[in-house]
Amino acid sequence: RVMKMKQLNPRSVRDQIYQVLKEEIMKFRLVPGEQISEKEISERYEVSRTPVREAFLQLSKEGLLEVYPQKGTRVSLIDLDLVEEARFMREKLEKAVAELACEDFPQEAMFKLEQNVKMQELSIAQKNYESLFELDEAFHQTIFEGCGKANVWAAIQQMNVPFQRIRFLRLAADFNWNTIHQQHAALTEAIRTKQKAKAKEIAEEHLQLVIVDKQM
């Protein structure tokens, strides 16, 4: 796949390369352990090596690439310990935010949740796990933002990458799609009817779906 990225602004080129490579890694088009090179990427997208090198550096900071001077660059393997740490953090924070949402949640945010749940149903019917993955993330982000905790959500993203990679892999394997949708629908209803205990329970169960089995 060749995509030209001719932009006057080098930062824009770097950002585009970064976003494309991140999506390819997160969605396993570039698989863990796969070798990639600055030369290959710069030729594929017809850009100089400088923005590619900068994109590689950013991806390595996020734990998605491992860069070895004089040896090359590869897509990082998934560290299951980091996955479990991220899941643990999200479980604790999402339970707290679910309770907050039951106290006060804007109507506009509630509408977004309801529409999101409907779109998840459509994604499942179409067997579109990439869309379901994106809707899942957007669903949780909407709850945080609706509670005035957008900065907390942004902070979570710093540890969230290994967790997201496992979640995407499991969705691709047709892992509990309907259960995920049902839990989102139930959590939306619990928030709408201000059932704190129920919302907290569902949030915990939802994150328990991705407890890492290190024998898998």
Regions found by a protein language model. Give the residues of each.
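Hydrophobic, amphipathic alpha-helical faces that serve as interaction scaffolds
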Residues: 89-105, 137-174
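C-terminal all-alpha effector/ligand-binding and dimerization domain
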Residues: 8-10, 95, 114-121, 126, ...
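Residues in well-ordered alpha-helical elements
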Residues: 15, 81-84, 130, 150, ...
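Acidic/polar helix N-cap motif
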Residues: 79, 106, 128, 194-195
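Short linear motifs at protein or domain termini
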Residues: 1-103, 141, 211-216
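Hydrophobic residues in alpha-helical segments
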Residues: 25, 101, 124-125, 147, ...
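Hydrophobic packing residues in well-ordered alpha-helices of helical domains and bundles
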Residues: 86, 113, 132, 136, ...
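Amphipathic alpha-helical repeat elements characteristic of tetratricopeptide repeat
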Residues: 15, 91, 107, 111-114, ...
